Amino acid sequence: MEKALLEIEEKARLAKAASRPLSYASSAQKDAALKNIAACLLNNAPAILEANLKDQTEAKAAGMTAAMLDRLIITQSRLEGIAKDTLAIAALPDPVGEIFDMNTMPNGLVIGKKRVPLGVIAAIYESRPNVTVDIAALCLKAGNAVILRGGKETIHSNTILARLIRQAVEEAGLPQEAVQFIENTEHSLVNHLLKLSDQIDLVIPRGGAGLISYVKQNSFIPVVAGGIGVVHIYVDADANIADAVNIAYNSKVQRPTVCNAMDTLLVHKDIAAAFLPVVAAEWSKAGVEIRADKTAMEILENASSCKLIPAAADDWGKEFLALVAAVKVVDSLDEALSHIARYGSGHTESIVTQNYTSSQRFLNEVDAAAVMVNASTRFTDGSQFGLGAELGISTQKMHARGPMGLKEITSYKWIVYGNGQIRG
């Protein structure tokens, strides 16, 4: 164990040392590194898929659920998507060096801000091997060194991906030590990593509530967490039913295992009888299980062939990550807002309505990272928000909120231009 602890300290030290030349690397160099990464992924597809197959085999043997298994799978198509996302990050404007908020003071000093990298970012994450590439690419583009610590369930995939990333970075003339990967997945080592505040500037955990809570409680380093998503859609009395059905279907079914998938559907009582049987019929085609409150049960028990069970108390406020939806009929917009305030996680909430006043109340009163009107909750995503890939979706209010793109992993320094001024 002592050897493993020393190895982590050395990786952090190397990342810190590499962060300095990386911080002033040219945009062309950083973009070349990202393009190299994309090419390496595609050129080494057979080896990556073989490593991922090992992860799948071990995960199945360990009894991993289908929802969790889907998160770790890499297919040729998904690998091509990861490479495409990396190229998209390369094509984004480089935030480093941006000058903003410049003002001339009465004494003639010109004062403003210059955007700079944070330094070294440690990413602690679970399940998804694409996160290894996404986070490395974003950190490099923003001039940050990165320490990657994935979960044991994707160790084979992450190991080869990290090796290829380091190779691609070095081929672009940047220090490969700017990307560090911790192969030892022992839980106790995370605790040690979280104490290295002299080398690491920010920790980003991505995963379940247990991981995020552990990191927040044990870190000596600032943390920006990609929070869990307990996501609601409220179908207002003035909703367009066709739009509401499409939005509820897409939000639940398109990819149910991700944090921006809908968990709870709130429906105004005046539209429930017309709307619920239609959406339930569509959901039933995809195998969605509905956990309904008493009023929704009465409407749906004879209306469709959907999987229908009474909602339990703990179904409200639950992130299902599966083809399961809690459904509740509410008396008013006020009740919907109160329900979301009590059970929401601050991730994404959406209203479907044609009533402008209701939409504005929802936008103003819901406290979440992303609040939507007449749109699927699945849009809360870095690429959909024009940020490229993301490091996570923060449900915090400091330092970043919502999808975390390039600017969210930079800071700034004050710059001052003088002409011989002295303070009297």
From Swiss-Prot:
GO molecular function: glutamate-5-semialdehyde dehydrogenase activity; NADP binding
Gene Ontology BP terms: L-proline biosynthetic process
Enzyme class (EC, first level): oxidoreductase
EC number, UniProt record: 1.2.1.41
InterPro entries tied to this protein: Ald_DH/histidinol_DH, Ald_DH_C, Ald_DH_N, Aldehyde_DH_dom, G-glutamylP_reductase_CS, Glu-5-SA_DH, GPR_dom
Pfam families linked to this entry: Aldedh (PF00171)
Keyword Plastid assigned: no
Cited Gene3D superfamilies: Aldehyde Dehydrogenase, Chain A, domain 1, Aldehyde Dehydrogenase, Chain A, domain 2
Pathway(s) served: Amino-acid biosynthesis; L-proline biosynthesis; L-glutamate 5-semialdehyde from L-glutamate: step 2/2
Keywords: Amino-acid biosynthesis, Cytoplasm, NADP, Oxidoreductase, Proline biosynthesis
Catalytic activity: L-glutamate 5-semialdehyde + phosphate + NADP(+) = L-glutamyl 5-phosphate + NADPH + H(+)
Compartment annotation: Cytoplasm
Record has Zinc-finger as a keyword: no
GO CC terms, sorted: cytoplasm
Function: Catalyzes the NADPH-dependent reduction of L-glutamate 5-phosphate into L-glutamate 5-semialdehyde and phosphate. The product spontaneously undergoes cyclization to form 1-pyrroline-5-carboxylate.
Family indicated by similarity: Belongs to the gamma-glutamyl phosphate reductase family.
Name recorded for this polypeptide: Gamma-glutamyl phosphate reductase
Species of the source: Dehalococcoides mccartyi (strain ATCC BAA-2266 / KCTC 15142 / 195)
Gene name tied to this protein: proA
